[in-house]
Amino acid sequence: MAKKISALQLMAGIAALSFGFVSCSTEEPSPEPEPEPEGPSPYVAKVFDYRPAAGQYVNVIPEYEEGDTQEDMNRKALEAICGDADGMISLGGFGGYVVVGFDHTVENKAGLCDFRVLGNAFYATGQSEYGNSEPGVIQVSCDANRNGQPDDAWYEIAGSSHNGTESWIQKAADAGNDTQTVRDYEITYYRPASTPTKPTKEYIRWEDNQGNSGYRAKNDTHKQPYYPQWIDEEKLTFKGTRLPQNAIDLSGQGNNFGLFRFAYGYADNVQSTLDPSAIDIDWAVDADGNPANLKGIDFIRIYTGINQENGWLGECSTEIAGIVDLHMCNIVIESAGIKK
């Protein structure tokens, strides 16, 4: 704030200039104080790659504008999920992902959860088993070569369906869902020739490496293209661990879908304020399922873990609203209480 100058001071200054007064003081002007350096942030500091699969919220959160490049969309994704921005990004259908980094190493503290991925999952009224769970698989990496880039080995957070099962699996199987966890799953989406003006169940074609094929449906609510418009490729291929299909039509009429929560270890799976949304770095495993034994992490990659259409709700698509270093926020959550 500028210092207020009195009329008397102003007049004295004018007089000094008029009569050529020269100060006899030998004192140097006081230097401006250096700004205090900002400390590390508990939130995401950079988005390295935002690459969603086809989905009803793609090109909307964040918004694609004509001419946007990959760099533009990375920037928009960061603006949506950094700090307390209160925004959100959609990863689209299975495989769509975002790669983020911190301005510090997130420490792995023994027996404690280390970070939390924020999403928009919630429970249905009066429920603690299902609601709007759209789980994303989480991978972590440390900057082993110290070049500031996410180009070192990735390790998967072994959530509850990695080697185990969920309490609702039989119910999902009875409903006709594919309840297998598939490692090395691969899916390819094909750019549609045009965007239909009316709802259709056959909008964006996909094929996977399990011999299955189908379409991403187009609904009446979201009228924009569902294929990411800044990507030039005519097809998009994603790989990863595919989780069991968790959406069940509870009504039998196609108008009341319950998306059942997984026990632990995934993004956008339970409400972000609840302990099971927290992640312990000790859950990270290598490609052979062996503990990664990481002292800390610098990068996180999250991708949508389910390939499923849920009637009028649309596809299962992981949404991300941010990531928080729990230790920097003095939030203590014991991982043993979650993984049980």
Which sequence ranges carry the predicted segments?
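Short loop/turn segments immediately following beta-strands, especially the blade-tip
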Residues: S141-N147
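Bacterial N-terminal signal peptides that target proteins for export
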Residues: M1-M11
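Tryptophan-centered short beta-strand motifs
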Residues: G148-I157
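A generic structural signal for short, non-catalytic loop/turn and secondary-structure boundary residues
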Residues: L10-I14, P150
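Beta-strand signatures of extracellular beta-sandwich domains
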Residues: V137-Q139
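Bacterial Sec-dependent N-terminal signal peptides
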Residues: A2, A16-A45
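A domain-level signal for the mature, folded cores of soluble proteins
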Residues: P31-E134, G159-K340
